[in-house]
Amino acid sequence: MANVTVIGAQWGDEGKGKIVDWLAERAHVVVRFQGGHNAGHTLVVGNQTYKLSLLPSGIVRGTLSVIGNGVVFDPWHFRDEVAKLQGQGVTITPDNLQIAETAPLILPFHRDLDGLREDASGSGKIGTTRRGIGPAYEDKVGRRAIRVCDLAHLDDLELQLDRICAHHDALRAGFNEPPIDREALKAQLAEIADFILPFAKPVWLTLNEARKAGRRILFEGAQGVLLDIDHGTYPFVTSSNTIAGTASGGSGLGPSAAGFVLGIVKAYTTRVGSGPFPSELEDEMGQRLGERGHEFGTVTGRKRRCGWFDAVLVRQSAAVSGITGVALTKLDVLDGFDEIKICTGYELDGKTYDYLPPHPQDQARVTPIYETIEGWSQSTAGARSWAELPAQAIKYIRRVEELIQCPVALVSTSPEREDTILVRDPFAD
């Protein structure tokens, strides 16, 4: 059977949660493969609204959910999120949720370092969520990380603590912070271990067995391609690779397992925090998009910056991530605009670009080249078929397809999961 990998094709917050929930009903397994609890998903199921930041979206429907080895895992946040969802009536047990034994832990001093660095950066802030994601990935790459499997071997942790504390104590001294309290840390780990360990499994084995059995696997990406550590607007990016190729390394399945790569894009563009944003609207039009789209971050609550759809960036995202088709979300937010613009290129120092230059100073200085399309007055909210869309909305969708060189597979017209127009089924064999 076909697998599907869902990724954001902009700067995150594209509406992946709803699309993953819509697909998860037919998936046998849902997998998170990168990131941490720094990116949120909002799911609306009936009269219930669920806000997730670490758990795979499939857990809400009881689908087997997996947190892969590519995720940096905060055990205390995990416990809180599980408790919150259980309070909303969601069943979460080791029977329907597994955590990779090799996932690195986010520890309290990672959060400390994240905040200390951001505060010391002044105008150079990159907009971190201060949740310790970056420092935890640094320790993983530096071979200092304490991992989920270490919670079962707390008596054998001294050498690892020597390595990780030597590194962090030196950094903390530079901020006039005291050394890590090793005994307190061991006590914290001992306290949380009993809650975490029942969920710890060799998830690569679970996933390979599922694949051999012909079960549908849905890979759920976090953030978006434009926040990818290699392919995003560096340094205003996250600390992991967010492209679809990461689904393999972050879960323990081979690269052919990704299947249909579904890129999620808003019908306009948003960004949270600092960094270049060529099509940003810092005027009444941008404010109108933000108000109509309720653009506030799920995790941080920060107001999102808004702008017109940037076809250049989405085309770039589709290329580097091998996107098979896109899901266009929040089409209804554009209802009632007399004119709608699409960014089709950039100008910089007299030169025209059909891609975003790599240097941050150039990215900040490019001027967008726009194509203007007539808007529509008829509401698209709640539409579930092409027949319910106004002709100009269909024209807009078709023009987006042409410019990003990628077909639209789904169109979302409201937060409700059923308000979705299916053009091509990603799970079709």
UniProtKB/Swiss-Prot annotation:
Binds 1 Mg(2+) ion per subunit. Its EC number is 6.3.4.4. It is an enzyme of class 6 (ligase). Transmembrane segments: none annotated. Pathway: Purine metabolism; AMP biosynthesis via de novo pathway; AMP from IMP: step 1/2. The active site is at D13, H41. Belongs to the adenylosuccinate synthetase family. Disulfide bonds: none annotated. Mg(2+) binds at D13, G40. PROSITE patterns: ADENYLOSUCCIN_SYN_1 (PS01266), ADENYLOSUCCIN_SYN_2 (PS00513). Keywords: Cytoplasm, GTP-binding, Ligase, Magnesium, Metal-binding, Nucleotide-binding, Purine biosynthesis. GO terms for biological process: 'de novo' AMP biosynthetic process; IMP metabolic process. This is Adenylosuccinate synthetase. PANTHER family: ADENYLOSUCCINATE SYNTHETASE. Plays an important role in the de novo pathway of purine nucleotide biosynthesis. Catalyzes the first committed step in the biosynthesis of AMP from IMP. Its main location: cytoplasm. GTP binds at residues 12-18, 40-42, 304, 330-332, 412-414. SMART domains: Adenylsucc_synt. Substrate binds at T298, V299, T300, G301, R302, K303, R304. Homodimer. The gene is purA. One of its GO terms (cellular component) is cytoplasm. Coiled coil: none annotated. Its cofactor is Mg(2+).
